[in-house]
Amino acid sequence: FIIKKKIKKARVYISAAGLYELFLNGRRVGKNRLDPTYTRFDRRNLYVTHDITSFLKEKNAIGIILGNGWYNHQSLAVWYFDESPWRARPRFCMDLKVTYEDGTEETLSSDKDWKTNSGGIIFNSIYTGEHYNASLEEEGWNNYDFNDEHWKKSISTTAPSQNIVSQSLHPIKFKEILLPTEMRKFNSKKYIFYLGKNIAGISEIKVRGEEGTVLRVTHSELLDEKGEIDLSN
């Protein structure tokens, strides 16, 4: 979309059944993680507000990554989220409201003119993590000059409920970066990195290798008698 007037402020209001990451002109919007939080999706849905004033240019592009979250939970576990009555494919709705210096306002909303495509994340689950294929990632997909002719048109659908309200709780954010306190090498293909404490977080690794190489990163709270990871809990 194109903006031709001077901007005073701009806000985006986004609700998702599942999880989302929002991008504007190639930049990730906000520092929150795992938004929006869990609700009874068939009774209430939450929207999150972001100030995007500093993100906007004359020519702009919005990109969104959708994840399953608690809405489309496939993994089997004691809580039986895989049998939830609301379960369906992830979806979102969004309003972008721009206030111009001349006092006028403009609202851009998500609709069927948006385009969609699969990306590098080919599987994702709150419980079992994600599978990522870097060869499927399209560089610049969330920038204005990206050619999306091969992408498909999105499908217009309904929200899981008619009760969409603001998410008012404190967001999940990065607190600190932890480096491994110990590394154990079992063989040329298997390593364990010990962090020294039990945390909620994500792993970040930098690797080099041949195209098509498969890397598996598994998280565990326990070690067995041999010092290997134990997923029994």
Residues covered by each model-derived region:
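Extracellular/oxidizing-compartment recognition motifs
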Residues: 1-233
